[in-house]
């Protein structure tokens, strides 16, 4: 077993930790056995050295081990729609809006998220604003997925062991490995995923991590300028894991008959209230950039979740989900379901 001090010495010498060593180290941190000063040194050392696929995979596997899981007999059809955050773009809650549209098109969505770190509004913030109850038990979340097609897992409720590292993370003031672990540790075990990241380098890295963790169909995306969504302003880098193989390619809005925008100003918001207003406009069928970016991201989620055979088919299904009124009804159904447990 590696000690925290040995790990620190390895990292400051610019040497990577082997999978078993990272597993041991992570278990010690998640069990509260590593003092804050050493956690800070470990996170700093990993960041400076740059985390490897093996180190991230080991850390994610341990986080899953310690997580409070959602008990579902059949998780094979589940899809998660999630972003790392950290892009600083201040856009409205695109992935949360896409969740309702995807569910309206027949997807079973198990969304894992938290409060805002760098954005104007996190998934949990906007869900609370719309009246949803975030504090469901794992069993109630499983029931929500079965009944409404949507389950929201509020990250702090499922990763209580994070309390041992959270204060250090906050005090460091820079991105650490934990910024990318959240989207890799879905408590419902969703094997399919649309994952937005803040740097194109992470597309290849995290697709390989998810491959090793046993994911089935994943699209890891990074929009031009570091947006952790499929963007409207130009190309989006995609790393797709499917049938055990990874392929990387670029997509653009015009590939799907959607107008490329010069900037994202039309979809930026200042706070949670504005984000919910923008979401409601999309679900009400209002045309514009907000609708278009939701169509693109929902299409990718439907494709990742194997509901749509292609991104183009996904666009059609997403459009129909909104225009039929089913997406708006799905939001109301989900909120109503959660409130019965308030």
From Swiss-Prot:
- Cofactor(s) the record lists: Mg(2+)
- Enumerate the Gene Ontology biological process terms: L-tryptophan biosynthetic process
| Catalysed transformations (reactions) | N-(5-phospho-beta-D-ribosyl)anthranilate + diphosphate = 5-phospho-alpha-D-ribose 1-diphosphate + anthranilate
Pathway membership of this protein?
Answer: Amino-acid biosynthesis; L-tryptophan biosynthesis; L-tryptophan from chorismate: step 2/5
Residues the record lists as binding Mg(2+) 2: 228-229
Record GO cellular component, one term: cytosol
Q: Which InterPro entries match?
A: Anthranilate_Pribosyl_Tfrase, Glycosyl_Trfase_fam3, Glycosyl_Trfase_fam3_N_dom, Glycosyl_Trfase_fam3_N_dom_sf, Nuc_phospho_transferase
Q: Which UniProt keywords apply?
A: Amino-acid biosynthesis, Aromatic amino acid biosynthesis, Glycosyltransferase, Magnesium, Metal-binding, Transferase, Tryptophan biosynthesis
For the ligand (Mg(2+) 1), the binding residues are: 95, 229
Residues where anthranilate 1 binds: 83
Which family would the database say this protein is a member of?
Belongs to the anthranilate phosphoribosyltransferase family.
> HAMAP family this protein is in?
TrpD
Whom does it interact with, and what assembly results? Homodimer.
Protein name, UniProt field: Anthranilate phosphoribosyltransferase
Tell me what gene encodes this.
Answer: trpD
């Amino acid at each position: 077993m590696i000690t925290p001090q040995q790990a620190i010495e390895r990292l400051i010498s610019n040497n990577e930790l082997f999978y078993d060593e990272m597993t041991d180290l992570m278990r010690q941190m998640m069990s509260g056995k590593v003092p804050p000063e050493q956690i800070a040194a470990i996170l700093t050392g990993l960041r400076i050295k740059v985390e490897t696929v093996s180190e991230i995979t080991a850390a994610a596997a341990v986080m899953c081990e310690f997580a409070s899981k959602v008990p579902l007999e059949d998780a094979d059809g589940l899809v998660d729609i999630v972003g790392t955050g950290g892009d600083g773009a201040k856009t409205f809650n695109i992935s949360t809006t896409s969740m309702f549209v995807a569910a309206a098109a027949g997807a079973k969505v198990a969304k894992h998220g938290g409060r805002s770190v760098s954005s104007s509004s996190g998934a949990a913030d906007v869900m609370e604003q719309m009246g949803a109850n975030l504090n469901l038990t794992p069993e109630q979340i499983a029931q929500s997925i079965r009944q409404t097609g949507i389950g929201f897992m509020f990250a702090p409720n499922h990763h209580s062991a994070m309390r041992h590292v959270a204060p250090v993370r906050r005090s460091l003031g820079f991105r650490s490995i934990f910024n990318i672990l959240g989207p890799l540790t879905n408590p419902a075990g969703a094997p399919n995923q649309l994952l937005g990241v803040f740097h194109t380098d992470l597309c290849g890295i995290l697709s390989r991590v998810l491959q090793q963790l046993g994911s089935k169909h994943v699209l890891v995306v990074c929009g031009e300028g570091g947006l952790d969504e499929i963007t409207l302003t130009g190309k989006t880098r995609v790393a797709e894991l499917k049938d055990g193989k990874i392929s990387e390619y670029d997509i653009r809005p015009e590939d799907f008959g959607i107008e490329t925008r010069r900037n994202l100003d039309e979809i930026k918001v200042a706070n949670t209230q504005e984000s919910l207003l923008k979401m409601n406009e999309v679900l009400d069928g209002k045309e514009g950039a907000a609708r278009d970016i939701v169509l693109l991201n929902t299409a990718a989620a439907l494709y990742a979740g194997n509901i749509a055979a292609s991104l183009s088919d996904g666009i059609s299904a997403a459009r129909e989900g909104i225009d039929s009124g089913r997406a708006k009804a799905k939001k109301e159904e989900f909120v109503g379901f959660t409130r019965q447990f308030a």
